[in-house]
Amino acid sequence: EDRKYTWDEVYKRAVKFASALSKIGIKKGDTVSFLAFNTPEIFEGHYSVPMIGAVLNTINIRLDATTIAYILKHSEAKALVVDRQLHVEVKKALKSLDKKITIIDINDKHADQSKVEKIGDLEYESFLNTGDDNFNREMPNDEWQAISLSYTSGTTGNPKGVVYHHRGAYLMSTGSSVAWNMPSRLNFLTVVPMFHCNGWCYP
């Protein structure tokens, strides 16, 4: 069964997820990592994480355990939202971390359940539902405040972190809307992986 959300529903779900993150202690400046396919959850993450002033870090699903662990350590991730289909490499990566981080599992109902394993103690939908509908999102007090942290592929060594700021994200989205002459009710097919430069900045 396909999942369909209106923009209003996406906004409300993002608010609730932001609230749920806040309740477990995620705050302004903290990094929240996502390791997931192009699913509604990672899309919502692009909105929910910045709502609490936290920094979104999307990780390439094709990386090995060593590289995943390096990114989680280097980014100082406080939480990891991860698709259970990626359990093999993720479990290896988590074993090498110096400290525990909060793990929130995405359980994709479309996945082959024989190849899915539980990773953390929290499940995305259940966790989201602990959030408050009336949560007051935090606006950035500085346009240069970090909104996301991406990593290079690391072809000549360890991956390098690249910080994007709220100003850049705003100007990119506004400029694209004008340049593409986007209508108010746009249907958009995202074919670029959302872990890759945040879907080339069009999530």
List the model feature ranges, each with a label.
Residues 1-39, 43-47, 64-69, 120, ...:
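Conserved AMP-binding/adenylate-forming core of the ANL superfamily
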Residues 6-8, 147-171:
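Conserved AMP-binding A3 loop
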Residues 14-18, 56, 166, 173:
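Short amphipathic alpha-helical/adjacent loop interface patches that line ligand
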Residues 23-24, 51-129:
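Structural core segment of the AMP-binding/adenylate-forming
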Residues 32, 49, 80, 146, ...:
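Conserved S/T- and glycine-rich ATP-binding loop of Class I adenylate-forming
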Residues 43, 47-52, 74, 196:
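Short hydrophobic alpha-helices that are characteristic scaffold elements of the AMP-binding
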Residues 104-105, 116, 120-121, 129-151, ...:
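Conserved pre-ATP/AMP-binding loop-to-beta segment of ANL
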Residues 170-189, 195-203:
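Conserved AMP-binding/adenylation subdomain of ANL enzymes
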